[in-house]
Design a protein with these regions (language model features):
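N-terminal glycine-/serine-/threonine-rich phosphate-binding loop
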Residues: 1-79, 92
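Conserved phosphate- and dinucleotide-binding cores of soluble alpha/beta proteins
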Residues: 4-7, 55-226
Length: 226
């Protein structure tokens, strides 16, 4: 059921993709649906180039036949389609539970439009309700960064995979910081990034142009207020 909702929302996002566009390709389960559906359109004749936000997305895009390009060749992306782990009423986001938060943020900020595709369980009203804030950290600075996050409140756990520290595509560690409800996402995002050794966080404030949410009652399209 949930997987079907994600697929429906991904198909709805394809309406924004036009011939000749440069498209940012997100990471995660919902983005996977979008990449596969975009691949079907490409095979049918749609001409686009994709910029993936992770090695995982790059491999899938190649598999389904989407031509790829880079930010070096195209500094401006027409539209990026990605998922999110939480979406607030103001369309701020927590992302990065898939581990690609830094590249996702780079691509998002290079995009004219960012469409976030989710199922209804991700609409949480406020951020920090269900998900931790992923924080990407240079390995040398791990304990300093963890200590600072704990001082601010909550618990910060090193993400692991198969008994070893999880490594991002950039070769960094990720701390999952259970902060609790977030009142000012933009301020906290800036505060976290100000810690030496922290690369960035999974708070995406003022980034999403539109959120497409698949619900049991149908597709909801939410626009950021101007």
């Amino acid at each position: 059921m949930m997987d079907d909702l994600k697929k429906q929302a991904s198909i709805a996002a394809l309406e924004a993709i036009k011939d000749g566009m440069i498209v940012g390709l997100g990471t995660g389960s919902t983005a996977t649906h979008f990449i596969r559906e975009l691949g079907v359109r490409v095979q049918a004749g749609l001409r686009v180039h994709g910029i993936p936000t992770s090695e995982e997305s790059r491999k899938l895009a190649v598999e389904v036949g989407i031509p790829l390009t880079t930010l070096r060749e195209h500094l401006i992306i027409d539209v990026t389609v990605d998922g999110a782990d939480e979406v607030s009423d103001g369309l701020d986001l927590i992302k990065g539970l898939g581990g690609a938060l830094v590249r996702e943020k780079v691509v998002a900020h290079a995009s004219k439009k960012v469409i976030i595709v989710v199922d209804e369980t991700k609409l949480t009203g406020r951020l920090g309700i269900k998900a931790p804030i992923p924080v990407e950290v240079v390995p040398f600075a791990l304990e300093v960064a963890r200590g600072q996050l704990i001082l601010w409140g909550g618990e910060a756990k090193l993400r692991e995979k198969e008994g070893k520290p999880f490594l991002s595509d950039n070769g960094n560690y990720i701390l999952d910081w259970w902060h609790g409800p977030i009142d000012q996402p933009w301020a906290l995002e800036k505060q976290i990034k100000g810690v030496t050794g922290i690369v960035d966080s999974g708070i995406f404030a003022n980034v999403a142009s539109q959120v497409i949410a698949a619900t049991s009652a149908g597709i909801r399209k939410l626009q950021r207020a101007e």
